[in-house]
Amino acid sequence: MEFSMNATVEQLAPVEQQATTDWVVAALYQFKEVADAADLQQRLLDLVKTINLCGTLIVASEGINGTVAGDRHAIDTIREFLLNEGFHAMEYKESHSAEKPFRKMKIKLKQEIVTLGVEVKPRDLVGHYLDPKEWNELISRDDVILVDTRNDYEYKAGTFKGAIDPKTETFREFPDYVKQNLEQHKDKKIAMFCTGGIRCEKSTSLLLQEGFNEVYHLKGGILKYLEETPAEESLWEGECFVFDGRTAVTHGVEEGQNVKCHACGWPLTPEEVALPSYEHGVSCVYCIEKTTEKQKEGFRMRQSQIAAAKRKRL
């Protein structure tokens, strides 16, 4: 039986800290046995009440995962706390944002730190890790099947040249995709990638568990690739969707040009924003025909409330 216990703490940092203009964004995860996940959740809650931090951390018996943002002191504090808790092998990446990327700080207690819905053992069985140079060499080969393990809206913002889109809406759908589309390719080289690497820890573990022979994944995910790979050597096309206020990033992990439709969540290019179907917070080319006028009116009301709240803070 799946459970999900969420705890949310509002920002309690001093006003002068809230004026941060250089938000350090830290994406992190590690698969590690956690003896008492509920206790770790509570101690994290106690800590984040004392520092200027926003974002989400997911805690489970299998480890920790999340993205948080704050000033330098806050990020260093949370990282030191996790290191002291034994998370010495975290996959950890930093980038920057000029604006606050998340509204709140959430610490969630869940059954999985990334939900696949199928039991796998990524601490014991995972695919071969490849650095960016090795990755470029592998996916340039004709005998490799390249699979994007992310969701459809993420694929839309950008992907690697030649990558297959599984057309999943959630990661839970990925095991079914494997059964229906990859089972006949167990003797092939399979290369997989995701945003920060965590979904590939589970997807490669799944394939190996199912009897696939050669399974590879990009160490550190797309974010690490964009951070380390010069644009002129890159096989990445488009931008990388991220789950914060930046919407998407590009090479150097710099903020991209895509913006998010706040009605449906899909990333939009500047050209799509210029279409008549786009109304900020209300509709875009991908959802305008999928919502009723009553729903659109509700979205407009929500946007008015958001705008009023922003004016009040100024």
From Swiss-Prot:
Residues forming the catalytic site: 194
E.C. no: 1.14.-.-
GO molecular function, one term: oxidoreductase activity, acting on paired donors, with incorporation or reduction of molecular oxygen
Reactions performed catalytically: uridine(34) in tRNA + AH2 + O2 = 5-hydroxyuridine(34) in tRNA + A + H2O
Keywords: Oxidoreductase, tRNA processing
InterPro entries xrefs: Rhodanese-like_dom (IPR001763), Rhodanese-like_dom_sf (IPR036873), TrhO (IPR020936), TRHO_N (IPR040503)
Domain Rhodanese: 140-234
Domain of life: Bacteria
GO biological process: tRNA modification
Signal peptide residues on this chain, from the entry's feature table: none
Pfam families registered for this protein in UniProt: Rhodanese, UPF0176_N
Family annotation (NCBIfam families): PRK00142.1-4
Record function comment: Catalyzes oxygen-dependent 5-hydroxyuridine (ho5U) modification at position 34 in tRNAs.
Family recorded in the similarity comment: Belongs to the TrhO family.
Identification of the protein by name: tRNA uridine(34) hydroxylase
